[in-house]
A protein has these predicted regions:
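Extended, compositionally biased alpha-helical segments that mediate assembly or anchoring
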Residues: 488-503
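A cross-kingdom signal targeting lumenal/periplasmic-facing segments of multi-pass membrane
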Residues: 133-154, 159
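Tryptophan-rich substrate-binding surfaces of secreted polymer-degrading and adhesive proteins
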Residues: 1
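Primarily the internal scaffold of c-type cytochrome electron-transfer domains
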Residues: 4-14, 24-118, 156-304, 308-484
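Single-pass type I membrane protein transmembrane segment
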Residues: 16-18
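Asp/Glu-centered strand-loop micro-motifs enriched in Gly/Pro and often flanked by an aromatic residue
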Residues: 105-137, 141
Length: 503
């Protein structure tokens, strides 16, 4: 006789089926709704022109990305050593003033803020001087290269060599939109693309084709357009008279390879005011240092950590709030690392502490070398006597600056930076030993006093910098010429139509 199923069991099965169907229906509805949201979000509102520099225009088609991009305005996050707030680094470390004596960075050097401040911070910097017209001021037009999506537009209109020619002030009314969309994206496909010729040219000289880079490589290469070491080549064949932006990678990207490149062409950024050494100023070799680290070795890109993926309404997109991963650990570090936040922070700070400790020791040695070299000159040293000493100063400070200017390098590649700093310490000490022998030969057998540079003001006074005059001139520029630039730019952009698609 067949077993009869109890009525209660039938009811349970019936109710379970209803519940299952209900939740499947919710899931299907959610998927359909999210697909609809994604389709809607991908409908372009405007047609973006090939050289469109205005980030807000791109934002009409990509509101999520643009909304996150505007978070770059924030400047209230601080880590142990860095962050996104404006910090006067010369006040934090007055020794920098002496290291850069005779160079623009001794006037003004602040910790970088978000990309949205690229134009305003450059205008406000004492390094760009106080031009009164298109043909005055200390800096070349090339200094705009990495600051704005207006740059590829102007390069297309005028030519690359022409862009690099003349004074910084010449392009003041042309370059007004801060770093943004067109710097990294194709206007039609949104694919990542290289918009600055210096990176492409550097690849060509190394025998590489940047067009063969993978998408993952491009997620770092778009950053490498600017976060690299570079110099202004004023002797480039066919571009004489310009300050042609060039990456010194022909023989490799290591600190030694770039040093050899510069030495071979006898290039110098400036002559040091105290020691008279032919100096090199490292710009920001972040990409070169990153390539020597474990994350690059594992295939992790810049964007993976500094611009991680986000999800919203069924849409996956890249967070364009470009910031320290320490302000977004969950979406950056914890995608791969499962340690607790406190442990991850400790790992980062431990590496930074150790690199900065040794970097500061090198820094003091070089300050002493500059001051001792000045003493030798004052005592009548000859150029022949000083030649090798000055090269030691040049090479040791190049290594210090390579480590100091590669922002984040103490985490990106602590092993390599530790090696670079150690060779810098050795070179600085060798130079100081030679100086000690020369000073004795010149009749001085005492210790050259270390200068009183406890504050930025004292350090700038020590090197004879007329700070008050520079600030007064800068304020005049900001009140008189800068507003004229903005007025002309507004008039020009008012004639650039925004074409709506009417979808």
């Amino acid at each position: 006789m067949a077993n009869k199923r109890k009525p209660i069991v039938n009811w349970i099965l019936f109710l379970a089926t209803i519940v299952a169907v209900f939740f499947l229906g919710l899931l299907a509805s959610s998927i359909t709704e999210r697909r609809a949201e994604e389709v809607t979000s991908c409908k372009p509102e405007v047609k973006i022109g090939e050289w469109e520099p205005r980030n807000e225009v791109w934002g009409k088609n990509y509101p999520s990305e643009y909304e996150s991009y505007m978070l770059n305005d924030e400047s209230d996050f601080a880590t142990k050593y860095n962050g996104n707030a404006m910090i006067d680094m010369l006040e934090v470390d007055p020794r920098l003033v002496v290291l850069w004596a005779g160079y623009g960075f001794s006037k003004d050097y602040n910790q970088g803020r978000g990309h949205t401040y690229a134009i305003s911070d450059l205008r406000n910097s004492l390094r760009t001087g106080a031009p009164v017209d298109d043909n005055t001021g200390p800096m070349p037009a090339t200094c705009w290269t990495c600051k704005s999506p207006d740059v590829p537009r102007v390069m297309n209109e005028d030519g690359v060599k022409e862009f690099y020619t003349g004074k910084w002030a010449r392009l003041g009314d042309d370059v007004v939109n801060p770093i943004g969309c067109a710097d990294c994206h194709n206007n039609e496909t949104m694919d990542l693309q290289i918009s600055r010729p210096a990176l492409v040219e550097a690849y060509e000289r190394m025998g590489k084709d940047i067009n063969k880079a993978t998408h993952q490589e491009m997620r770092s290469l778009v950053c490498a357009q600017c976060h690299v070491e570079y110099y202004f080549d004023k002797k480039r064949p066919g571009a004489e008279g310009s300050a042609y932006l060039t990456f010194p990678w022909d023989g490799g990207m290591s600190v030694e390879a770039m040093e050899e490149y510069y030495d071979a062409i006898e290039f110098k950024d400036w002559t040091h005011k105290l020691s008279k050494a032919p100096m090199l100023k490292a710009q920001h070799p972040g990409y070169e240092v990153y390539l020597t680290g474990i994350h690059a070795e594992r295939g992790v890109s810049c964007a993976d950590c500094h611009m991680p993926y986000m999800s919203e309404g069924g849409k996956k997109y890249t967070d364009h709030h470009i910031q320290s991963p320490l302000n977004n650990i969950e979406n950056s570090c914890m995608v791969c690392h499962k340690e607790k936040t406190a442990q991850l922070l400790k790992d980062v700070y431990d590496r930074q502490d150790r690199i900065i400790e040794t970097r500061d020791k090198l820094e003091e040695l070089i300050v002493r070398a500059h001051v001792e070299a000045k003493k030798a000159w004052d005592l009548g040293a000859t150029e022949e006597q000083m030649k090798d000493i000055l090269m030691d100063i040049r090479h040791s400070q190049w290594r210090w600056d390579y480590a100091a200017a590669s922002h984040g390098g103490s985490f990106h590649s602590p092993v390599e930076l530790g090696r670079v700093i150690s060779t810098g310490i050795t070179t600085a000490q060798e130079g100081r030993i030679k100086l000690a022998r020369l000073l004795i030969e010149l009749g001085f057998d005492g210790e050259v006093p270390y200068p009183d540079i406890e504050t930025k003001a004292k350090a700038q006074e020590f090197i004879g910098l007329p700070v008050d005059k520079l600030k007064e001139e800068k304020q005049r520029f900001l009140k008189e010429l800068a507003p004229e630039w903005d007025k002309k730019a507004k008039e020009r952009e008012s004639k650039m139509p925004i074409v709506y698609t009417n979808n």
